[in-house]
Amino acid sequence: MYLYNLTLQKATGVTHAVHGNFSGGKQQEVLLSRGKSLELLRPDSNTGKVHTLLSTEIFGCVRALMAFRLTGGTKDYIVVGSDSGRIVILEYNPSKNALEKVHQETFGKSGCRRIVPGQYFAIDPKGRAVMIGAVEKQKLAYIMNRDTQARLTISSPLEAHKSNTLTYHMVGVDVGFDNPMFACLEIDYEEADMDPSGDAAQRTQQTLTFYELDLGLNHVVRKYSEPLEEHANFLVSVPGGNDGPSGVLICSENYLTYKNLGDQHDIRCPIPRRRNDLDDPERGMIFICSATHRTKSMYFFLLQTEQGDIFKITLETDDDVVSEIKLKYFDTVPPATAMCVLKTGFLFVASEFGNHYLYQIAHLGDDDDEPEFSSAMPLEEGETFFFAPRALKNLVLVDELPSFAPIITSQVADLANEDTPQLYVLCGRGPRSTLRVLRHGLEVSEMAVSELPGNPNAVWTVKKRADDEFDAYIIVSFVNATLVLSIGETVEEVTDSGFLGTTPTLCCAALGDDALVQVYPDGIRHIRSDKRVNEWKAPGKKSITKCAVNQRQVVITLSGRELVYFEMDPTGELNEYTERSEMPAEIMCMALGTVPEGEQRSWFLAVGLADNTVRILSLDPNNCLTPCSMQALPSPAESLCLVEMGHTESTTQGGLDDDAPAQRSGNNKGTIYLNIGLSNGVLLRTVLDPVSGDLADTRTRYLGSRPVKLFRIKMQGSEAVLAMSSRTWLSYYHQNRFHLTPLSYETLEYASGFSSEQCSEGIVAISTNTLRILALEKLGAVFNQVAFPLQYTPRTFVIHPDTGRMLIAETDHNAYTEDTKSARKEQMAEEMRSAAGDEERELAREMANAFINEVLPEDVFSSPKAGLGLWASQIRCLDAMHGQTMFSVPLTQNEAIMSMAMLKFSIAADGRYYLAVGIAKDLQLNPRISQGGCIDIYKIDPTCSSLEFMHRTDIDEIPGALCGFQGRLLAGCGRMLRIYDFGKKKMLRKCENKHIPYQIVNIQAMGHRVYVSDVQESVFFIRYRRAENQLIIFADDTHPRWVTATTLLDYDTIAIADKFGNLSIQRLPHSVTDDVDEDPTGTKSLWDRGLLSGASQKSENICSFHVGEIIMSLQKATLIPGGSEALIYATLSGTVGAFVPFTSREDYDFFQHLEMHMRNENPPLCGRDHLSYRSSYYPVKNVLDGDLCEQYLSIEAAKQKSIAGDMFRTPNQICKKLEDIRTRYAF
């Protein structure tokens, strides 16, 4: 078996976010790390929309990310710490739209190791030095400088190691232009390590240590170290030099402390708590992330607590000595991994879980009536301030970036009967959890819909002048009339436009600088800007059947075969070319390209004929309408469209969009593509040679059951093609790649580009008798999603086969059930009433009632933390088509759903489905202790509209996995595998196997075989012998694997994903037998007594691959109608991908050679060796990396040609191969 790994949706979770001026202009950008890829975003300061400039795989794990600027520089650089054992400095090149490596210095081994630096970064605020630290012992400092050409240089590393020291965080201290200084949170564990009693460990204190880099001596010294009272989790650097007092803010549990060297004494302020909080009162409060905003005149800090509350922190100074810390509640947003305050007035919040947000900072919170807390306010030790959370007041949400992370599990199914399967994904944590239904397609925003008096057959938009920014008219053609609408604040009908309204229109367009042209069956109207009209009438009884128009040319067909060509002269008149051309067959469609800049005409006309050919005719005045080339088609052409794609005029993208070989030429022009829509629903894309007119390199895609109609529109400043069949598709070029993506919208019939003040790049389209104005904002998106909120973290789900409804198990740790929450609120309210004196009793009663009635949405304000060992669970039935919860079954406090299965019991003989739910009671995670578990059985109503509770079976272990098996229930109870049958009062235990080593986490069954996954010992192959009623292990794996997901590929083959980001496929060799009777040696009888270490037969590992993210679900499924099966996976970070099988050894050899060349020619950006990355835990075997192969599309033309030459191919052939393998299985 040979597999090819394809990423369908890149990771959406964010691990690091930094902002800066990476492109060198005045614009602010945000650089995100998504674990193993980097993504550059640019928020539009006018609209607030976030645009993705580029996304690049680094084939490594990003551990740390910082932005810095050299003193006096105009752009920011990026320094990346990864698992490569190298420090890498990157620069964004806007002209190539790529991140380029400026420096790469090796300092240690590869991999995420505790003593290899790269986990922590600290930058001197003036950009003169960087310190890079490991979790333990090692720290290195590098000095940044410029050479004579003003290029960035980096020094040799200076060591600042200290043995037996753990580092928690480090920052660069702002000391102006004094020697660079770095502050570190450290713990020295030497004494604790030597003391066997553990007393020293209890006494160990965290220290704040300052390291100074002496630029004169080129040496790092430990300048100062001080023990801390509270355990701190991170540091915030305070502006220094001329801008502020310098020093650091130490964020620790319940306290915020300011420290600095010299005469400064410590300033300490408690972290405010929410008033009347339901949280466990013993639980401390910490800050989890921060953002600093500084201008020449002021600075402030935004710090966020783990509940999501943001506080604005300011420091009061007296002669550069800090005298007071002031805190003010700012707003509440979802808890974040990183926050960035941009100079354009935006706050970017990269959420820990769920979607990421961009907010406009509307107010700084200085003038509101929110109380301000201060370190100078007198408080007893251990007391704190209280505040009341509220809805957003200072922030305004302007954009949202969808994120699926964390994906808990997923399933491919076609519950909506749409032919194309949907992906049902359980995402999120706690009250921000969602079920998301993902469909392949672009999200469409409907700007306007209006009914028309009849069913139109075509629509166009035109500008009055060529240099106008927006369109002036929408022209709608009916069977016997033409309607002209003017575009302004509203869309209204006009009658004085010069268009003929009493006839249908075949085509209309802007002509020249300021004229319009209308082609109708009886002639051509040329409407000048002063409303003069020149008409050309069709001769005799002939009528115009087809036409093609651009800015300077008009081509028409008379009565089917005769071609007439018009061209505009310098005076603006439309002149007919003297000779007409007769085609050998009836003309079905025609297309002209746009006139290139600086040219007088488009040089070629494409004509589709009824004889199943498309012909290219020259429009050169010297040999006008002479054939240049011809291409035979499998069926008649329905429509043609000539577009220039693969280059950029884009202002939004801010970078060069160029693709494969064909696009690259010295003048940075794109390639001319002829798109051919066939009557059988197939779209062909062919490259048109701009000199000879030859057609080459044809690509094919099936779009739908209807004939394909094509329309040229503008997307992000570049040309794109809208293709309409039974679904509407958009073919466009984005981030160095061609995309052909369906629109998630109903069927359209005709369309044109649309541009107005409200919608600069839209589409105007017709569907039956309605006119629609649409906008596409999320170009590059793979999936269009619909999200349905859930209450607790979803754990697993099953789909009811008869109704398609979903039964979802939701369970949260550290949470209250609704009943417990109400009881706790009532208890706190009663305490408020009883604590009040006689004169305050009425006020206390009002406050208690207000507290009980107050409902803060938990998806924003977080749910209360109940304490360790407290669980809340429920079973939800959801109609995934409409997102409607049919019913929910809440469980009592401290019952946690661990597993769930839907099955039919053969003994019940009612043909009904039953739901088995595995529950743990009073589970404590660390150490793992519980009061046992139970299996609840529910009978499912045939319409899945209710669950009937049958009975509960108590067991002494936690039921970690359940599975239906031959009309009975297989249960993994701790490390015991049991078969239960249905009983009247409880489940009846029929059979047991005690030889799984640790804990069963997954069970699959097929035929007489059971495939059982252990938490850390991979998969066991078990045979059920019905005659002896025995479960016998007959084979197992040779390697330990910490299993997260499995799926069966066939009777002998299973795919396994583990906690370290690996996928492996295990297959039983032909020699393995699962029948004990065939073994004459009698050794198999020993397994049952557990005398051998594992089974005597072993599975073979046939595929291994390191994905780099924890795979949470695996499924063998098809993603496109008529496509082949692939192994679909979803990861914790939000990635959706597929392992697709090679159908021939020849294809495998081709891609293996391409991968090998790409490793050499385009090594990973952050210095990790690609082969060692994909072999991080087990050597990569029989799996090729499609992500690396597809980078071929975006490397330089010279490298493309070199690789193609070495492989005895052309660059176009390689690009076609890459496109074909993707479209055969996925999208």
From Swiss-Prot:
Broad class of where this protein is predominantly found: nucleus
A single BP term in Gene Ontology: mRNA splicing, via spliceosome
Cellular location(s): Nucleus
Keyword vocabulary terms for this entry: mRNA processing, mRNA splicing, Nucleus, Spliceosome
InterPro entries for this protein: Beta-prop_RSE1/DDB1/CPSF1_1st, Cleavage/polyA-sp_fac_asu_C, RSE1/DDB1/CFT1/CPSF1, WD40/YVTN_repeat-like_dom_sf, WD40_repeat_dom_sf
GO cellular component terms attached to this protein's record: catalytic step 2 spliceosome; nucleus; precatalytic spliceosome; SAGA complex; small nuclear ribonucleoprotein complex; U2 snRNP
GO molecular function, one term: U2 snRNA binding
SUPFAM superfamilies xref list: WD40 repeat-like
Pfam families linked to this entry: Beta-prop_RSE1_1st, Beta-prop_RSE1_2nd, CPSF_A
Listed transmembrane segments: none
Domain of life per record: Eukaryota
Family: Belongs to the RSE1 family.
Protein function: Involved in pre-mRNA splicing as a component of the splicing factor SF3B complex, a constituent of the spliceosome. SF3B complex is required for 'A' complex assembly formed by the stable binding of U2 snRNP to the branchpoint sequence (BPS) in pre-mRNA. Sequence independent binding of SF3A/SF3B complex upstream of the branch site is essential, it may anchor U2 snRNP to the pre-mRNA. May also be involved in the assembly of the 'E' complex. Also belongs to the minor U12-dependent spliceosome, which is involved in the splicing of rare class of nuclear pre-mRNA intron.
Quaternary organization: Identified in the spliceosome A complex; remains associated with the spliceosome throughout the splicing process. Component of the spliceosome B complex. Identified in the spliceosome C complex. Identified in the spliceosome E complex. Component of the U11/U12 snRNPs that are part of the U12-type spliceosome. Component of splicing factor SF3B complex. Identified in the SAGA transcription regulatory histone acetylation (HAT) complex; the interaction is RNA-independent.
Name of this protein: Splicing factor 3B subunit 3
Originating organism: Drosophila melanogaster (Fruit fly)
